[in-house]
Amino acid sequence: MNTHPTATLHMASGSKIVIELLPEAAPNTVNSFIYAASRGFMDHHAIQRIVPGNWVDVTYQAFGHKECQYLIPNEFELHPEIEPLDSHPGCVCMGGYGEDGLASCEFFFPLRDCPDHKGIYPVFGKVIEGMDEIWRLEKVKTRPVDFPIPGVEVNEPVEPEVIEKVELDLKGQTYLEPIRMKVQNLPPCWTDMR
């Protein structure tokens, strides 16, 4: 029997994306995702960034909640014994800000194999239902958005693509609050939230 927790993203389009979370692959990252999702911080959120051929980036502003405005250590710092998973379509990865740490809950769906992401943007889940919705999102019409980090391409959907609700099934397990970075250089894309 599979005891992995799942997260179901109910989309305003009527579709759903079901993610199997992988706590043995990225324990603290899974804890951080569950922390945000269980408090409703991801609900009613419009997807903020789509880069066709690369990824669907759900948010780059901590879902607009100051409670999600924290960084977590890279998994290899907490769990050097865990071999990171390869990043490819069908995976769910956590974004990050280089040496400053991983984003608290800013996850993305890769649209191609990303060998350069291994060990940097941890794979913490896999899509078990709804890849067709992710491929649909790749093709929606987008417009460019000014972004405060040089060299980062940001295009948002012209028509909002909204996650209405994230439904968790923790399979009766309890998950701890995430370990957070003690000293934080917060990303410039969070500036307008301070």
Task: Describe every region a protein language model picked out.
Residues 1-194:
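Cyclophilin-like peptidyl-prolyl cis-trans isomerases
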